[in-house]
Amino acid sequence: MPEGRRVLILGGTAEAVGLATKISGSWNVTYSLAGRTRRPSLPENVILRTGGFGGADALADWLLENDTDRVIDATHPFAHRIALNVQRACETAGIARLKLVRPAWKPVPGD
C-alpha cells in the first residue's frame, strides 16, 4: 500500500469503482458505500467501508481520525443529502473535496 496520501471515495456508481481502481496504486483508498448497493469488485488494497457516517459532523470526525487528505464524492447524482453532508464535513475538517459530475443527458434518436 502506498505511504502517506489517503483518500475517501464515496461510491455507488460505476465511475467510482473505476476511479478507486485507477488510483489505488498511488493512494491509500477507502471506498465507502451506503450499503444499498451490491459489493463492488475492488483491488485488494482498497478498504471497503459500508454504512453511513451519521451526518456531516460525524463524517468530519471520521476524516480527521483517519488522517484523510482528500475526499471524492462519486455518489449517485440524485444522492443530494450525502453530497451536502460531504461538502459540510470537508469544510469543517479543512479537507479538499472533489465532486464527480456526470455529463448531462442529451436525447438521441430513438429515445
Locate predicted features.
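Phosphate-coordination loops involved in phosphoryl transfer and adenosine-cofactor binding
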Residues: 3-4, 68
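Short amphipathic alpha-helical segments
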Residues: 20-22, 43-44, 83-87
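Glycine/small-residue-rich loop that forms an oxyanion/phosphate-binding "nest" at active or ligand-binding sites
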Residues: 60-111
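Short, structured coil segments at secondary-structure junctions
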Residues: 25, 43-46, 93-94
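N-terminal basic/disordered segments at the start of proteins
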Residues: 5-35
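Glycine- and other small-residue-rich loops at beta-strand/loop junctions that grip anionic moieties
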Residues: 8, 51, 75
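Short acidic active-site motifs
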Residues: 55-59
